[in-house]
Each structure stands twice: as structure tokens, then as C-alpha cells.
From Swiss-Prot:
One of its GO terms (cellular component) is ribonuclease P complex. Keywords: Endonuclease, Hydrolase, Nuclease, RNA-binding, tRNA processing. SUPFAM superfamilies: Ribosomal protein S5 domain 2-like. It holds the Pfam family Ribonuclease_P. This is Ribonuclease P protein component. PANTHER family: RIBONUCLEASE P PROTEIN COMPONENT. PROSITE patterns: RIBONUCLEASE_P. The keyword Nuclease applies. It comes from Streptococcus thermophilus (strain ATCC BAA-250 / LMG 18311). Belongs to the RnpA family. It comes from the Bacteria.
């Protein structure tokens, strides 16, 4: 995923949490904020409660891969995906389907 597609700065995360709206399902929480950008930007958050560094990085890699696979269907907004407990045991297909579900609830996913 290119750097221009990532939310990295603390002020951007803070703006998303303060001014954005949130939706959730059992595996993910998504905060989103419309910024009128030419493409989407995403930030990933995986807590230490999910496991050691190897486990957290595996979850982040799978999330990034799923987001790039669905990039043509995503709205051009900033959003943060927070992984909840239990996502570390899911396969890529389950992560993809849960992510699509929560992004549809957030109205970030176009069919």
C-alpha cells in the first residue's frame, strides 16, 4: 500500500476519532471522516491484547491486503480500522468478509 493511502500522523488520527463517526461489528471498529480526497486513506490499529508482534503484524498484513483487493470499491474518505479480539484466528477470507460487512455499514464500500 502506497504511503499516500495511509493515515500516519497523530493529528489525523485525532481528527478521525474526534470528528468522525464510528461503526462496528464483532471483529472490527471503523472510524471514518470525509475529507474530499482523490483516494481513500486508511489507518490500522491492532492492540497488544491480540498477541505478540508476529501475530499483530500478520493481522495488519492481511488487513492491508484485503483493503488493496477492494480498493476500487472504497469511497474516497479517511478511515481507521481497529481490530478486535478474535480477529487473529480468522483466515484471510473471513477477515475480508468481516471487513466488507463493517465497511458497508459505514457506507464506505460500493457494490
Amino acid at each position: 500500500m502506497k504511503k499516500s493511502y495511509r493515515v500516519k500522523k497523530e493529528k489525523d488520527f485525532k481528527a478521525l476519532f474526534d470528528a468522525g463517526h464510528s461503526v462496528a461489528n464483532r471483529k472490527f471498529v471503523v472510524y471514518c471522516l470525509d475529507r474530499n480526497l482523490p483516494h481513500f486513506r486508511v489507518g490500522l490499529s491492532v492492540s497488544k491484547h491480540l498477541g505478540n508482534a508476529v501475530t499483530r503484524n500478520r493481522v495488519k498484513r492481511r488487513l492491508r491486503h484485503a483493503l488493496m483487493d477492494m480498493s476500487s470499491q472504497l469511497e474516497h474518505q479517511d478511515f481507521v480500522v481497529i481490530a478486535r479480539k478474535g480477529v487473529e484466528d480468522l483466515s484471510y477470507q473471513d477477515i475480508y468478509s468481516n471487513l466488507v460487512h463493517v465497511l458497508k455499514i459505514a457506507k464506505l464500500y460500493k457494490d
